[in-house]
A protein has these predicted regions:
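Nucleotide/pyrophosphate-binding catalytic subdomain
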Residues: 1-134
């Protein structure tokens, strides 16, 4: 059975995309053609009634490229790059999804979110509400 056949009957699909899939290896720039293709595939899946959750890396890589910095070595450098990169990444997702009349949302989850019962429940409820709203 192929991967497509396995997904055919699934209602909810989670897609994890890493930094290397979002950026050009040579330059570190966002690979907008690849991201646009991903957005188109997700929009098509949603059009078929699938609930799709995109788990996206890339904030640090995008921030590093935007700021023209070296590879981050400290937590502070990683957080600074991520702060800039996450905003840029979400801007790209918002723009591309809007071309398909789709809305992108962002939920930031940490290990602490998962470990704390209240935080985990709140995150779960947020996911369910977003999926319900479409």
């Amino acid at each position: 059975m192929t991967e497509r056949e396995l997904l055919k009957d699934k209602k909810r699909i989670v897609i994890k995309i890493g930094s290397s899939s979002l950026t050009h290896a040579e330059t570190g720039d966002l690979n907008l053609a690849k991201i646009e293709k991903l957005v188109r595939i997700i929009s098509d899946m949603r059009g078929m009634g699938k609930e799709v959750i995109l788990v996206s890396s890339g904030a640090i890589a995008t921030g590093r490229q935007t700021l023209g910095g070296k590879k981050p070595e400290t937590v502070a450098e990683k957080q600074a790059y991520a702060a800039v990169g996450q905003a840029r990444l979400m801007m790209v997702y918002q723009k591309l999804f809007s071309e398909y009349n789709q809305t992108a949302a962002q939920i930031l989850i940490t290990k602490a979110t998962i470990l704390d019962d209240t935080s985990r429940t709140n995150a779960k409820n947020t996911f369910n509400e977003l999926l319900k709203l479409g």
